[in-house]
Regions:
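Sec/Tat signal peptide C-region and signal peptidase I cleavage site
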Residues: 18-25
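Short, surface-exposed beta-strand/strand-loop-strand elements in extracellular ectodomains
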Residues: 61-82, 120-124
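Exposed aromatic-hydrophobic patches
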Residues: 41-47, 91-98
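Bacterial N-terminal signal peptides that target proteins for export
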Residues: 1-9
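Noncatalytic modules at the cell exterior or secretory-pathway interfaces
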Residues: 50-57, 98-113
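Bacterial N-terminal signal peptides
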Residues: 9-17
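Solvent-exposed serine/threonine-rich low-complexity stretches and specific carbohydrate-binding patches
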Residues: 30-35, 79-87
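Short, surface-exposed binding/anchoring microloops in extracellular/periplasmic proteins
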Residues: 35-65
Length: 125
């Protein structure tokens, strides 16, 4: 009886371990608090160097997203052009860097539909 209970507990723990590692691959790189209509870009400083292979953008309110600029630890940068309207809680597709990069700064360019909008930037290893 104890053997069955131990085996069941081991199976549950192994399933939980796999589910946490799958969600640990995606993390929040940063987010903006406001995108105002008169100021068409927002800077998101990344406090620590975060390694990411690809990124995804999520709009917390309606926004027109034009481009996002990522700056890396070695001084280089990468620009992703979007030129599209994102509705509330809509996400872009995953955009890949060439290889895993250390992101230090993010600039989001766009216009808020109602004067303010939140943008969340996700990273994946």
């Amino acid at each position: 009886m104890k053997l069955k209970a131990t085996m069941a507990a081991a199976m549950i723990l192994s399933v939980m371990a796999f589910s946490t590692t799958a969600s640990a691959d995606t993390f929040t790189l940063g987010r903006t608090i406001l995108l105002e209509a008169k100021n068409n870009h927002a800077k998101i400083p990344v406090p620590l160097c975060r390694n990411a292979k690809s990124i995804q953008i999520k709009a917390e309110r309606d926004v027109f997203l034009s481009k996002v600029i990522f700056k890396f630890q070695n001084g280089s940068s990468r620009v992703f052009q979007f030129q599209r309207k994102l509705d509330k809680n809509e996400r872009t597709d995953w955009r890949r860097f060439s290889y895993e990069r250390c992101v230090t700064d993010i600039q989001v360019h766009g216009r808020a539909e109602d004067g303010s909008a939140g943008i969340r930037v996700y990273g994946r290893r």
